[in-house]
Amino acid sequence: MDEDDGLLLNFAAPSSSEPTGNKAKKSGNKVTGGRWKDRRKLQLSLQGRGRNQKKEKIVATGVNSTDIDNSRLDRAKESLDTAKEKPAQEKRRVPTNQDHLGPSSKRIKFKETSGEFGGKNSSYVSSLFTSNEASSTLTPTDTSAATTTYLPSNAPLKDATTFDGLGLNDKLATHLTESLRFKAPTKVQRSVIPSLIATQRDLFVKAQTGSGKTLSFLLPIFHKLMSEEKYKITRESGLFAIILVPTRELCTQIYGVLETLVRCHHHIVPGIVIGGEKKKSEKARLRKGVNILVATPGRLADHMENTTSLDVSQLRWLILDEGDRLTELGFEETITKITDNISKNSKISETIHKYQGLPTERVNVLCSATIQDNVKKLGNMILNNPETISVDSNKQIEGTLNFDDEEEQNNFDSNNSEGKRMSAPDQLIQKILVVPPKLRLVALSAMLKKLSKETNSLDDGVNRRTIVFFSCSDSLNFHFDVFTRNGNMFKKRKNRETDKFETVEVPYYSKYDNEDDNEEDKPSILTAPILGSNSCVYKLHGSLSQQQRATTLQAFIKEKNEGKNSAKHSILFCTDVASRGLDLPNISSVIEYDPPFSVEDHLHRIGRSARVGNEGSAVLFLLPGNEEGYVDGKIRVVHPKEDNLRIISYEDVLKEGFAEPEEDQEEKKASTKPDPKKRFGKWDIHATTWHLDVERWLLEDSTAHDRAVQAFTSHIRAYATHLSTERSFFNVKLLHLGHLAKSFGLRETPKKLGKSVGGNTGLQDVNNSKKIKKEDPRKKMLRMAKMAINSNSSEFNY
């Protein structure tokens, strides 16, 4: 003690249970349960990082080792204790990828190392089966009960009426029944043919699509021309009939019907002039002489101004088919110019005594599926005191009236399905598929796979066909690329053994690396191995060249495809260019992937199926929410047979398309009850894998990705063009753009996609490593030449 300096040191040794130093701050007590705010406050308090912690926290020495002010900490602990006593259902669910301190950001980012646009560049991989809006008003229809089978409303008549009984030429009637295999006339043919043969009065024909309107006005013209015996009608006699139609495809189809009819009388010569073809060739055909001319309004007006060999002085019939579509495309002024030119140059009075069996004045015929205001305006311009013939499938109305008589017209409208609407065929089954936006692509794939399986299971040798309608050509091109990946193209090659040309499948290698490739250089017919071994996809829209459109349509119409591996299931991706008037054989199904822009467009689309008494089905894709009201607001009115309007579940469609064949059998054999919490089976894994393959393909191929972005933006623009009367169902402001972009295989945010398309840097900043290739001067010259040729055509490119 003597050596002691008098100082006494008091050391407070910490207990072994208490953490020391920074370890205490880092490890701390793990806090679980309760509100996030309370958990955060408690965690910070335990780490010594609370608000005003230095001022409020006073550490005592000696026996008192607790904080003086612990009121906030105690309140936080009490709130946690009460939260733990609440039932599990009321607890807030925390995603597995988050720690207990809460999310680090507003959205969860997933890193993708295999793709160019993955990882940090605003790329998000969302699940297909989460955050999907459920259907609120429409419930799936129970199809287990027996359904009523309705008789076809547009089938040929099965009574004693025949083509001979309608007053047609015996030779022509025999050709129809024996060579062309027409058994009996349809309702509209029974009403129109006698009227055109017996009278010279202008005519307005209203009938549903697929009812045989084309033959109803072609047969009387042929009958009259064939009946001239004293002065036989030849190509030198002149032009006697002009048929105006809105689209080139319908022109080609009517011309094909004319070619089959002239086989019984070779002296009559048909002709065709349409936009996209060479004017020089058309002028040569007109110079040789034609008796019946099928044309589009723009090209016909062009020839009337510039082709002197086109003589319309002897014109006896002017037929306007699809009058409602002619007015929608803005051809009123062109048609007025055509009719004025015909009236100005008419010289019928000079040949009345020569052709005594032909009309003494021009007969105008207007065919339309509806009597809308614009159609009435067109009728008032070209028709003179016309007779109206209408065939209503619902009330069996077959009558005539004065077109200009408002009182008679109003009475007719009230009896004839409100006069302004046509109806779907009675035998057509209309299905409504309400599918969330993220699942649109996989739902379409599942439906096409199902149809391919059904077609392949049938060994009757009949080629089934399906039509899928899109709202714009950009979306069509993207989906065509998706479903024809790794597909083969068809080429004709000479067989060395037989010395004949055969159609064979050749692997098609996509040229996406060449950014200067023109759309016309790519094939419009490819096989679809991802849908089935015997599936083939065609594309048809107005941006293709006329040669491609004609070749594609002709290949699709063929009864049997040539080649060893002929496609049994043919699928046509098209816009509304193929919705009017085209008579395509064996169309078993019509899929409206994008909603129509009007009810009339819907009826024309589904009218490609269930034609002339045949069975058919149609599927309309709708989004949950406001679009469901479109069924009761617009669709149900034009489908009078309620049993044939059915709501189907998208889960059932996905199961049928992606489920393995053994799964259904295992579920039936299983004796145990299924787990109610397990909503999905293996089919959802297959669907997710299929969709992820599409996304990875877009990440690996920059040009394909750009086409997907263009398709997405074009789809949104097309969606915004719905009629104002239907804006309550199709409101672009209510779309979930992020989920909709998912259906195009895109992982970027819609805002970033909009910047890339709008001309800003956008995605280009992400892909700085790739340099844009300079266009080859030779290819640029050829492309500019093609643009110049196309610009010379005055035909509306629809």
Swiss-Prot record:
Residues 69-93, 666-678 have a biased composition (Basic and acidic residues). It is an enzyme of class 3 (hydrolase). It catalyses: ATP + H2O = ADP + phosphate + H(+). ATP binds at A207, Q208, T209, G210, S211, G212, K213, T214. GO terms for molecular function: ATP binding; ATP hydrolysis activity; RNA binding; RNA helicase activity. A motif (Q motif) lies at residues 161-190. It is found in: Nucleus, Nucleolus. Residues 1-105, 402-421, 659-678, 752-776 are annotated as: Disordered. Keywords: ATP-binding, Helicase, Hydrolase, Nucleotide-binding, Nucleus, Ribosome biogenesis, RNA-binding, rRNA processing. One of its GO terms (biological process) is endonucleolytic cleavage in ITS1 upstream of 5.8S rRNA from tricistronic rRNA transcript (SSU-rRNA, 5.8S rRNA, LSU-rRNA). It holds the Pfam family CTE_SPB4. Residues 443-670 form the Helicase C-terminal domain. A motif (DEAD box) lies at residues 321-324. SMART domains: DEXDc, DUF4217, HELICc. Its EC number is 3.6.4.13. Residues 194-389 form the Helicase ATP-binding domain. InterPro entries: DEAD/DEAH_box_helicase_dom, Helicase_ATP-bd, Helicase_C-like, P-loop_NTPase, RNA_helicase_DEAD_Q_motif, SPB4-like_CTE. GO terms for cellular component: nucleolus. The Q motif is unique to and characteristic of the DEAD box family of RNA helicases and controls ATP binding and hydrolysis. ATP-binding RNA helicase involved in the biogenesis of 60S ribosomal subunits and is required for the normal formation of 25S and 5.8S rRNAs. Belongs to the DEAD box helicase family. DDX31/DBP7 subfamily. Present with 1460 molecules/cell in log phase SD medium. This is ATP-dependent RNA helicase DBP7.
